[in-house]
């Protein structure tokens, strides 16, 4: 079992055969060693009990019911006075049945088997270490050809040092047929190596430090050579250099983790605990079994057949032995990763078997669904909507979610303030939704941050902390500026909310994970809290105005026609002259009174520097008054001058949307300046 206090992390890697044996082997009180699964059976069809030494054997994996052996005898678990601790008839220990969730078994393979993950997955670690083509290694593993053993001290029967399958292809057919099983074994064990055993021998003979040194020397030699002028040759050199770098990194990893390369070839195959590959009885007496059980059965069947061929039969041709070794290799490949070599294996209903890789990988795999994606207490989930009135570090929680998340804190507050005598009374007050409950809830939420997470959490900003406030409705309100860190938008995205309970988690949430403390991207350092999506659309609508310029009303024939039929009034500015305002407050007031629209053009009095106005710009139109004053109308501003050409005032042509946007920016700049002045 994994103790959460002793084990802080989980690492998946290669293990030695001795470690696999230590995991699965156990010594029962009578001194007998059990752990090897030798029979491909599961349950007896008459007694409906696990078969001995089978895939669900109670001697190997523990009892199905706590304290009850296969014979039906019962002992109290943990009672030292009860002797013996196991059944002398069936050999089953009187222990808790939960042992079947972690007690493993093993299958002793008659021939070595290459782990398909390290052979067929890209990049192929075995091919990288041996510096050989993957196709050649596959032919060797699946017994398509053989090679001569590199024995230097003794003369070989064939007097060969390298591979001979390229020169005489017919040998791989003639030699196995010529020798009988007994003679072929002597010849093969001395002269020929094939199958995964050949790969294991080559991996065992490797010196990782020499591999690193030789690869480094070759890499330097290739780097010293200049371009050849041939594009194809230059690409080959670049690919070779990249391969050498990967090979050196792989060898360093093996040395650093104390892993032997020959462990990539299996001699013992671990058997998963029965509870992780169950057989369930459904209505009608039918049984539903995990696909892994059928794949394990196939491995045991073929392995036992190979054992019989090598031990009992004396006249079996060697070719048949090699074919059976290939079948064992393919059965283990299907168990580990079905379909990695091409067409996947299917059952009688043409359904693809679910291998070990399929069980653990993907969104519905063991890790993401059961270990990483499991539901936890003090958490909730809802759709996110925009909260434009929120501060950057705040989020809005619905009352329904907040009262569930902080229910224990509210109960403690009710009892401390003597508003409830016990937990039951406090829960009844919460169910009745009394006003005092919401007051205490707000007090609790003020001092307790929450964590918001949006899947998939691909980087650090995928989960951030916020100060929660109560909102109406059933959706979580979020400030739009934090959407980029979550890669979220408001088209139906959902987010999970978690409550940090320990003091360490709360301190981390306040000091490191608050949204207003994560304004820069941890990857490249660029600002992460920038307007995106909805905010950009809103700013565009706010500042778009009318696309037609100042001459639209005068030179548009449709507007002229409408102008002639329109009744002129002081409150109608649609096709009459554009209104003038002395300040922004009057313009916004007119908008609130619905006298003008958000994008209606207007003239606003403004303190504009004369140097900003281009002196060479020609006015579009000039309006003269009876007293000699005149208005020079330009594309974006208007100047009121006297008879002596003195400037009385300047108006700019804008909209209410531009005014609102400008005021927000001005207030933000003033607030930032005040904060800087206070800091200094």
Swiss-Prot record:
Mg(2+) binds at residues 489, 491, 493. Its cofactor is Mg(2+); Zn(2+). GO terms for cellular component: chloroplast; DNA-directed RNA polymerase complex; mitochondrion. One of its GO terms (biological process) is DNA-templated transcription. GO terms for molecular function: DNA binding; DNA-directed RNA polymerase activity; magnesium ion binding; zinc ion binding. Binds 1 Mg(2+) ion per subunit. Zn(2+) binds at residues 69, 71, 87, 90. DNA-dependent RNA polymerase catalyzes the transcription of DNA into RNA using the four ribonucleoside triphosphates as substrates. This is DNA-directed RNA polymerase subunit beta'.
